[in-house]
Amino acid sequence: MGFQPPAALLLRLFLLQGILRLLWGDLAFIPPFIRMSGPAVSASLVGDTEGVTVSLAVLQDEAGILPIPTCGVLNNETEDWSVTVIPGAKVLEVTVRWKRGLDWCSSNETDSFSESPCILQTLLVSASHNSSCSAHLLIQVEIYANSSLTHNASENVTVIPNQVYQPLGPCPCNLTAGACDVRCCCDQECSSNLTTLFRRSCFTGVFGGDVNPPFDQLCSAGTTTRGVPDWFPFLCVQSPLANTPFLGYFYHGAVSPKQDSSFEVYVDTDAKDFADFGYKQGDPIMTVKKAYFTIPQVSLAGQCMQNAPVAFLHNFDVKCVTNLELYQERDGIINAKIKNVALGGIVTPKVIYEEATDLDKFITNTETPLNNGSTPRIVNVEEHYIFKWNNNTISEINVKIFRAEINAHQKGIMTQRFVVKFLSYNSGNEEELSGNPGYQLGKPVRALNINRMNNVTTLHLWQSAGRGLCTSATFKPILFGENVLSGCLLEVGINENCTQLRENAVERLDSLIQATHVAMRGNSDYADLSDGWLEIIRVDAPDPGADPLASSVNGMCLDIPAHLSIRILISDAGAVEGITQQEILGVETRFSSVNWQYQCGLTCEHKADLLPISASVQFIKIPAQLPHPLTRFQINYTEYDCNRNEVCWPQLLYPWTQYYQGELHSQCVAKGLLLLLFLTLALFLSNPWTRICKAYS
């Protein structure tokens, strides 16, 4: 709908005036013109707004004559309109509002969806200073009866059927919106002329629009289908067509009636106390202050959560990377008191502090500022928690914290380690079993060193850190069943003593195997050497003092031990409750030597060269018993080999043999007799048998 000529002329003048006033820095409305289709509009009055008054007038441009704006008279209300002014910083927010409400339109209009507007007026908002007009805002009001969201919507809401019981798409081949799909005869967008072109080639079945066809298992389908078997009347299904197996075949329920899911329910932020009746596996551990006992943990997304609750009987070993500039020490656990209602008291953690020796293992990319006057700060690099549990309670908590002293302004990346273990209260030590009785995959190989007082140990490999030097490498245990290769670098100078280099290499390699015996089983007793403990076989142990070739040439050493090969023989040793138990039959270590020569560039500078040394672990599985050799029949007639064919005829009666241990033998016999009865009935009801009976009768 266009404006009348006077209003259009006034609009052009106001637009030109507003642009010029903005350039001159005078009062101006932004925007100078508004088309209003709702109950309220707002504009900004910018410039020198001190002492400015705002007035509102309804323009009646009948007979092509517009009234002269009355400035200086405060008039912010009319019979149907009101204007409010909210002051701001060198700006006034001017809001014009319709006072009657849009319900007035629906009460006066019989057709709420009429094409003609309900309100059609022109408003003029004027800003005056010292009784003189300074700026104008022209508002063209054009409001329809159904233009507001507050209008009552029609009750004819489209009901989306539940696709579990009714197909949402009655025409699955209708793939293109607003166009006719060829060969889709159920497409409503196809005209009759187009449908005649491919009526004989329409899609059939569910895709063609027959979304509720009678499926083959219906009893009614057997009466119209030829060649149905004789047993069909006994096993057919009596079901209405509405219960079809094609429901959701093409539409998988992307739109369905909304149901409140569990994660949308209001979540109480207060900690739930699970300790009143004892802990269950997975329950968070509570403190006496009704709060969770938290230790930093790593989420599934890889982020480190500082306030993650500790779950009962859940062990974990995580590492968190933190920027030292953003690091904040957690509240000390010395004051933490764990709730233990079942024992009628409180469990206080026993904390032991140790100083970290090598900071290069924990802090990388370090940058220490020259600020000697600042006091150092203490950071925790490792925290080990041992929880002793008894039934559903916690009886003891032992904590060992490794801390380091760094500069207060030191920068870098710190890697923290947090270990939590739950042990039974009657366990004599903190060592865990690696299986019961056989080893479990991924558990540490248990070892003993009878030459030491504290003889409990394990076999290790290197875990490099930083530059990969052996001086900064840490140890990690050898896990059962995992073949691993690890190594580190030795710094060697051009004037290195070969004998001392061999001693250093042998010492580094021997540090991985600080044991004399390994456990044959995962539950071998550390206190009883005869309880399945095997002595480690050491082959070709080098003599560091022997120099095979005395040479005065610098930068060359022969027969340097550089590789340690650890071979572990394992085998299956029976089964417990159907689970195969594996044990260790022997462990052998063997050294390999290399000839080292200093690598020079253009010139041999006095810089340290790097000698790589490595260690490998190989688990070799051998059969507990030698397999029986194949017979000539098994070699020639492979169709009876169950390992080469999908159908295994020799195992047809396997459930009734003594080798089947899935259930009791008596149950297998009973089920077999029942199956034989069904086969006999099927034989009597079959078509050949009925013919024989008719022939005799």
Curated annotation (Swiss-Prot):
Chief site of localization: membrane
Membrane-topology annotation of the record: Single-pass type I membrane protein
Gene Ontology cellular component terms for the protein in this record: ciliary membrane; cytoplasm; cytoskeleton; MKS complex
Glycan attachment sites: 146, 156, 391, 497
TM spans (from-to): 669-689
Function as written in the Swiss-Prot or TrEMBL entry: Component of the tectonic-like complex, a complex localized at the transition zone of primary cilia and acting as a barrier that prevents diffusion of transmembrane proteins between the cilia and plasma membranes. Required for hedgehog signaling transduction.
Subunit structure: Part of the tectonic-like complex (also named B9 complex).
Name of the featured protein: Tectonic-2
Origin species: Homo sapiens (Human)
Gene: TCTN2
